[in-house]
Amino acid sequence: MQGRLSAWLVKHGLVHRSLGFDYQGIETLQIKPEEWHSIAVILYVYGYNYLRSQCAYDVAPGGLLASVYHLTRIEYGVDQAEEVCIKVFAPRNNPRIPSVFWVWKSADFQERESYDMLGIRYDNHPRLKRILMPESWIGWPLRKDYIAPNFYEIQDAH
């Protein structure tokens, strides 16, 4: 079933894939990494000016990594907000997705956390570096194929 935003994107010739609706009735779309930045700008201009959250997850061991964006459009009031969920998948051997920091500033720390935990590189992010783990940490702790070290010493811990 195609939602309202998906129909609008089709009408304007914008490449995407409808993934239906989640359990709360929120339309979910899949966007290719190479299309994501331009579609993000279009969605912002269309009225999705609030990035509610961004997260990422490992789809399956050895499989794809996903970056998920929950966008909100408030046109007629807070009680009538329109939401959409965007999923952008990337291969685990070179997970690169365009950053939307320059579209929604609130993506800053959220994209950094996704980089820190899963190793997704957000191209053109101004400060893409670890935010939770020490800079010396090896690997991406939330990947399903991550092997935790037996011992890790944090220098200068008090």
UniProtKB/Swiss-Prot annotation:
One of its GO terms (biological process) is photosynthesis, light reaction. It is found in: Plastid, Chloroplast thylakoid membrane. SUPFAM superfamilies: Nqo5-like. NDH is composed of at least 16 different subunits, 5 of which are encoded in the nucleus. The gene is ndhJ. This is NAD(P)H-quinone oxidoreductase subunit J, chloroplastic. It is a peripheral membrane protein. GO terms for cellular component: chloroplast thylakoid membrane. InterPro entries: NADH_DH_suC, NADH_quin_OxRdtase_su_C/D-like, NADH_UbQ_OxRdtase_30kDa_su, NADH_UbQ_OxRdtase_CS. It holds the Pfam family Complex1_30kDa. GO terms for molecular function: NADH dehydrogenase (ubiquinone) activity; quinone binding. Its main location: plastid. It is an enzyme of class 7 (translocase). It comes from Oenothera argillicola. It catalyses: a plastoquinone + NADH + (n+1) H(+)(in) = a plastoquinol + NAD(+) + n H(+)(out); a plastoquinone + NADPH + (n+1) H(+)(in) = a plastoquinol + NADP(+) + n H(+)(out). Its EC number is 7.1.1.-. It comes from the Eukaryota. Belongs to the complex I 30 kDa subunit family. Keywords: Chloroplast, Membrane, NAD, NADP, Plastid, Plastoquinone, Quinone, Thylakoid, Translocase, Transport. NDH shuttles electrons from NAD(P)H:plastoquinone, via FMN and iron-sulfur (Fe-S) centers, to quinones in the photosynthetic chain and possibly in a chloroplast respiratory chain. The immediate electron acceptor for the enzyme in this species is believed to be plastoquinone. Couples the redox reaction to proton translocation, and thus conserves the redox energy in a proton gradient.
